[in-house]
Amino acid sequence: MFVNFKYFSFFIRTKMDGVTGGGTNIGEAVTAPPPRNPHPATLLNANSLPPPFLSKTYDMVEDPATDAIVSWSPTNNSFIVWDPPEFSRDLLPKYFKHNNFSSFVRQLNTYGFRKVDPDRWEFANEGFLRGQKHLLKKISRRKSVQGHGSSSSNPQSQQLSQGQGSMAALSSCVEVGKFGLEEEVEQLKRDKNVLMQELVKLRQQQQTTDNKLQVLVKHLQVMEQRQQQIMSFLAKAVQNPTFLSQFIQKQTDSNMHVTEANKKRRLREDSTAATESNSHSHSLEASDGQIVKYQPLRNDSMMWNMMKTDDKYPFLDGFSSPNQVSGVTLQEVLPITSGQSQAYASVPSGQPLSYLPSTSTSLPDTIMPETSQIPQLTRESINDFPTENFMDTEKNVPEAFISPSPFLDGGSVPIQLEGIPEDPEIDELMSNFEFLEEYMPESPVFGDATTLENNNNNNNNNNNNNNNNNNNNTNGRHMDKLIEELGLLTSETEH
């Protein structure tokens, strides 16, 4: 390779002259001009203007047209983003040329804004106040620490500066994201509390439902037991033919006892006489399985009629006098079944007829004979008692008797007796009737023998028209014999 030494030597000589300062032109060309200082007025104008981000944010919040999306708070020291989605879609592109709400929040964080309320997007800064826009120039941007002077000379310092810058950027990012994380944590806590309340409520409802199910199961068990009892009862009734009849017998007897108890409370009601006679007719089931008709007792109805007329006979007050020696208490007799007759039970002489209502009079007390001296009377022996009236006001009453006119209505005792059938035991009663002569007291009830005979004959004629001929003849013979005996007793008493 051939080199031109002429040019090479010239180049070396020129270079040496520039280093030693021998040439002025070359030295002037090599020396760089000094830097220019900025004008003081330009620096003042640059420091008096607020950052563009703060100015745009202030104008956006101050605009009344955007109050539905972003507006000042009631205290006018902060602003609130009411609708972040619409804020990102409409306002951010208009003022900041992007639509990222997170970038807007990070930018606020770099200028020192803080989130006031965790439940909403409310930001505040000491220099960001409503109506005081000139305070925006006091808000400064946070600077990241970076070493530019010694970065080329010291690699370690350069790495340190880069690490510090990354830490500053990381801290700023953490500070910006802190608001969102805290808000999310608070929201999650509130949601957790709501879920816990709902869980407690659901557990209470479950416990209540379990209790109701247990009660329902108990009710079902009781219903099953009752159903089994009903089925066993029906099976027993079907298998045992006498079971149902016995059950009906028991119910009928219970109803009869209730009816008999009600009879005693209706003795003084005149209007219920016919109802009482019909209420005693019950269908009873006999022991042999046949249905028989229960008939009311003749002596019971006769006694009821006498008790109804007790107010018309004041002379009966002597029977309830405390000076009486003895008396008789009438008891109800059980119904006769299967053709068997039951006798009346004799009552001790100490039991008077005190249950008969009476009024006090001045008549002397009448002594009743002891029941032990009277032969036991059967029900059949009393059934053929005559139905005549024993008083006749048309006859003259002997002086030995008290006139019954003050005690009677119309001169007769209103005793109503039903038709009494014939009883074969009346003959035995008539044969033993003579013992009454020594115990028969003087009483104004029966009058003289003539009156009794006339009344008995009239009533016997009426009975003959209604009854059969055979029964009437038999009753007539019995009544004639009874009248004859009563007449003899009365005549002996008068003499």
Swiss-Prot record:
SUPFAM superfamilies: Winged helix' DNA-binding domain. Residues 50-144 bind DNA. Keywords: Activator, Cytoplasm, DNA-binding, Nucleus, Phosphoprotein, Stress response, Transcription, Transcription regulation. InterPro entries: HSF_DNA-bd, WH-like_DNA-bd_sf, WH_DNA-bd_sf. Constitutively expressed. A motif (Nuclear export signal) lies at residues 482-489. Residues 146-164, 454-473 have a biased composition (Low complexity). GO terms for biological process: response to heat. Induction: By heat stress. GO terms for cellular component: cytoplasm; nucleus. Exhibits temperature-dependent phosphorylation. Phosphorylated by CRK1. Homotrimer. Interacts with HSP70-1 and HSP70-4. Binds to CRK1. Binds to HSBP. The hydrophobic-rich region (HR-A/B) corresponds to the oligomerization domain. AHA motif is a transcriptional activator element. This is Heat stress transcription factor A-1a. The gene is HSFA1A.
